[in-house]
């Protein structure tokens, strides 16, 4: 009986410590998220010489990036599986 009470108390203390640690990490999360969003926006401004996944393309022209192929049915770049 005593051992189970100590075990339950230790579990509650552990739960409190883990909750406190995760809460302190969550305070930094919005700042990190915003910095990643703005970093992605800067990257979008650069133009590529090829078209990526689901970009529209013209079949027969080699417009898609490596490992992608222009689908003649849908007319967008898809992953080329080699079939």
From Swiss-Prot:
Propeptide: 22-48
Molecular function as annotated in GO: ion channel inhibitor activity; sodium channel regulator activity; toxin activity
Record PTM Leucine amide, positions in chain: 81
Annotated TM spans: none
GO cellular component: extracellular region; host cell presynaptic membrane
Keyword terms: Amidation, Disulfide bond, Ion channel impairing toxin, Knottin, Neurotoxin, Presynaptic neurotoxin, Secreted, Signal, Toxin, Voltage-gated sodium channel impairing toxin
InterPro entries named among the record's database cross-references: Huwentoxin-1, Huwentoxin_CS1
Expression sites by tissue: Expressed by the venom gland.
Signal peptide coordinates: 1-21
Keyword Glycoprotein among record annotations: no
Disulphide-bridged cysteine pairs: 50-65, 57-70, 64-77
Domain free text: The presence of a 'disulfide through disulfide knot' structurally defines this protein as a knottin.
Subunit and interaction comment: Monomer.
Record function comment: Lethal neurotoxin. Selectively blocks tetrodotoxin-sensitive voltage-gated sodium channels (Nav). Does not affect tetrodotoxin-resistant voltage-gated sodium channels or calcium channels.
Family: Belongs to the neurotoxin 10 (Hwtx-1) family. 15 (Hntx-3) subfamily.
Name by which UniProt lists this protein: Mu-theraphotoxin-Hhn2n
Source organism of this protein record: Cyriopagopus hainanus (Chinese bird spider)
